[in-house]
């Protein structure tokens, strides 16, 4: 958890936001996946958001579902994902590492055992995508027992009660959901991002990182201009992996070319 605090403090001093890429562990295979993660960090990633392949990924669009299928095709198991996490942590002692996953994977291990394992390999945060905040007590309590930050999603239409709960229960960072790709009526109830950010700040929530549909440096800049502490980009990165699936070296080069300007956009 402290890794997030020290990251945000350092970034504030440098007048920068955080750029955080998301990839699925083990996509397209363990060895290349580790190279991908090294490349993302070398290109300027401030923290990592990593998925563990799961057979029924509800919140994921087709791009990330395909990443999961590629990892499964390579025979990647949750146990191997934890071995990978330990290796990443050994190599990169200071970078915050977050997991984005589903409750079933936590239940399979037993909630307490899962978070104990996270602590052991050096994971800083866990976001369980399919557990609403009102059902989160056993997860967040186990997380805190094991020095892992419980992360909560703040949707664009969050009401005051939800904002207060997120501020009170969340640690590390707050996952601020952008309104990417949502049109028409659903859009109307959504508050402007800077209003949400101001409220979260008022309630002393963990710093907000904006995610969902972030694929250009301009979007990163806009998130930070609205008051977010940074931006998370997933599908755009996973798409690059997909496009260069048979050219591992080209893939790494393309990832670097994508990440560098995204990081530059965080500097005010």
Swiss-Prot record:
| Active site annotation, chain numbering | 49 (proton acceptor), 60 (proton acceptor)
Q: Which domain of life is it from?
A: Bacteria
Q: Known CDD domains for this protein?
A: Tryptophan_synthase_alpha
* Alphabetized PROSITE patterns for the sequence: TRP_SYNTHASE_ALPHA
GO MF annotation: an example: tryptophan synthase activity
Instruction: Show which residues constitute the signal peptide.
Output: none
Pathway membership, UniProt: Amino-acid biosynthesis; L-tryptophan biosynthesis; L-tryptophan from chorismate: step 5/5
Q: Which protein are we looking at? A: Tryptophan synthase alpha chain
- GN (gene name): trpA
